[in-house]
Amino acid sequence: VDLKNERNKQKALDLGSLSKEWGLVYFFKDNCRFCHLQSPLIKKLSTDYGFEVIAVSLDGSVNEHFPESLPDNGIGALLTKGQGIQQVPALFMVNREQTKSFLVSSGVVALEDILSRIALLGTKEPGASLFGGESLKDTAYPSASNPLNQE
């Protein structure tokens, strides 16, 4: 139990530092029942971990968890390279310099999974090896060996 508590404290510290570099953009609609399930979890990212959350309504509605929500004024198209938001709820993370953005989740996703994705996306480039070294997409993966034991 102590090890788990220590790991949770470290995760909170890591996410707290990521919240200084990254913000979140949350897309929703009022008539979306999944959005009503996901919204309180997204709010926890703000209250518990310090992430700035910009809530964007695709239908102009106001969300009870995000009364300061904004209408979509093109940010959805910007984050999706012109495709627009196809499914809600959708959560993106955007770095403070606005040079990078990543889709964190689409649909209802557990808070623990969202936190893991934020931690991973905030510290690794997509396609980068989780074990250090070269990108997995550029390296033949030796199936007979354990990647954790490679030198």
Predicted regions and their residues:
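Thiol-based oxidoreductase modules, predominantly thioredoxin-like and allied folds used
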Residues: 27, 50-75
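Short active-site neighborhood of thiol/selenol oxidoreductases, capturing the structured segment around
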Residues: 16-32
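Solvent-exposed loop/turn segments at secondary-structure junctions
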Residues: 29-34, 59-62, 99
